[in-house]
C-alpha cells in the first residue's frame, strides 16, 4: 500500500469510532467538548475513572490525531482537535448503525422468523440511541430547524418528544423572553430535562410533562397558543399502527396553535441524491422490518398536513441523509 494521505477512509473512521466510543463510555467526550484545556487528573476526577487509564486514553487520542497536545510537561495537557466536532458527527453515524442498532442487526435471522417476539426480546438501548443521535444531529439535523425557529422569534415553543430537554434549552438561550413546554413518554428523560432546566437557570421558563404525544388529541391545552410546535423524529413512531391518531394530532396542532407553525423533522423512505441513498435505504429498512414503522414520503407528509387544515407547507432537505424538515402554517 502506498504511503499517501487518503483522507477519511473506512479504516480511519473505524479507528476513530473505537476510540471515541471508549471515551463515551468513560464519560470523557463531553468533557473534551466543553473544556478548552484537559489533563488526565482533572478528566479522571470528572469521570470517576482511574487517572492512569485516562492518561493512556488521552495519549492514544493524541496519537490518533483526534486531540492536540498543548504541553508534554507533566501534567500533560490537551485540547480537542480542530476537526473534533466534525469527527464526532461522522462517527455518530457509525455508532448509531453498529452500536445502537446492534440488537437488530445481530439478531436479524430471529427478526425474520418472528418479528414481534424479536422486538420484545432485543430492544435497543435508549441511552445509546439518544447519544448517537445527538452525535449525528448536532451538525446534521439540529441546526436547520433551530435556525428556522430563531428566525420566527416565537414566544412559546412546544417540543413533542422532548427527551432530556436539550432542544428547548438551546432555543430559550437563543430567544430571550420565550417559554417552552416539553412532552415526552419517558419519565426518566423528563426528570433529566427538569434537572437540566434548573442547572441552566430556566425552571421558570420551561415546563416538562411526562405523557405520550397522543394525549394532545384529547387535551390540547399544552399546545394552546403555541407559536412553534416542533416534532423531531417522533411522528413516525405512530405509523402505521396509529395513523388515525397521527391525523388527529396534526388536526389538533392546526386547530389549537392558531397563529403557530408546526415543524416536523423526520426521514423519508427513499432518497434520490446519491449521497443520501445508502443511509436512507438502511434507515427505512431497519424501521420497516425491525421496528414495524412506516416512513412517509415528502408528498405523503404534504398531503397529510393539507388535510389537517394547514394552508402553507414547505419541505426542505437537511444535511442528514434522508432527513427532511416540513414547515406547516395556516
Feature roles, as predicted:
Residues 153-163:
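Conserved class I S-adenosyl-L-methionine
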Residues 186-188:
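Conserved SAM/SAH-binding beta-strand->alpha-helix loop
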Residues 238-252:
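A short, conserved alpha-helix within the catalytic core of class I
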Amino acid at each position: 500500500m502506498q504511503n499517501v494521505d487518503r483522507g477519511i477512509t473506512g479504516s480511519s473512521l473505524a479507528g476513530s469510532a473505537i476510540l471515541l466510543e471508549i471515551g463515551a463510555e468513560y464519560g470523557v467526550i463531553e468533557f473534551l467538548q466543553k473544556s478548552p484545556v484537559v489533563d488526565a487528573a482533572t478528566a479522571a476526577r470528572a469521570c470517576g475513572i482511574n487517572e492512569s487509564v485516562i492518561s493512556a486514553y488521552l495519549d492514544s487520542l493524541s496519537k490518533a490525531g483526534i486531540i492536540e497536545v498543548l504541553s508534554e510537561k507533566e501534567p500533560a495537557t490537551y485540547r480537542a482537535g480542530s476537526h473534533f466536532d466534525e469527527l464526532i458527527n461522522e462517527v455518530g453515524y457509525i455508532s448509531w448503525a453498529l452500536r445502537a442498532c446492534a440488537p437488530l442487526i445481530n439478531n436479524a435471522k430471529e427478526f425474520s422468523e418472528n418479528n414481534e417476539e424479536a422486538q420484545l426480546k432485543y430492544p435497543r438501548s435508549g441511552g445509546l440511541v439518544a447519544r448517537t443521535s445527538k452525535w449525528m444531529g448536532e451538525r446534521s439535523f439540529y441546526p436547520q430547524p433551530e435556525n428556522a425557529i430563531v428566525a420566527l422569534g416565537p414566544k412559546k415553543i412546544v417540543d413533542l418528544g422532548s427527551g432530556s430537554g436539550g432542544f428547548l434549552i438551546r432555543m430559550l438561550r437563543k430567544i430571550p423572553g420565550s417559554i417552552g413546554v416539553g412532552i415526552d413518554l419517558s419519565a426518566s428523560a423528563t426528570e433529566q430535562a427538569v434537572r437540566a432546566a434548573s442547572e441552566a437557570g430556566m425552571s421558570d421558563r420551561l415546563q416538562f410533562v411526562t405523557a405520550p404525544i397522543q394525549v394532545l388529541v384529547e387535551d390540547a391545552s399544552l399546545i394552546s397558543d403555541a407559536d412553534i410546535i416542533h416534532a423531531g423524529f417522533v411522528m413516525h413512531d405512530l405509523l402505521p399502527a396509529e395513523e388515525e391518531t397521527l391525523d388527529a394530532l396534526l388536526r389538533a396542532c392546526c386547530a389549537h396553535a392558531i397563529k403557530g407553525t408546526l415543524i416536523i423533522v423526520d426521514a423519508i423512505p427513499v432518497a434520490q441524491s446519491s449521497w443520501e441513498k445508502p443511509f436512507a435505504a438502511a434507515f427505512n429498512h431497519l424501521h420497516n422490518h425491525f421496528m414495524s414503522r412506516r416512513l412517509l414520503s415528502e408528498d405523503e407528509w404534504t398531503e397529510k398536513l393539507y388535510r389537517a387544515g394547514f394552508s402553507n407547507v414547505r419541505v426542505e432537505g437537511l444535511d442528514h441523509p434522508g432527513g427532511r424538515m416540513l414547515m406547516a402554517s395556516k
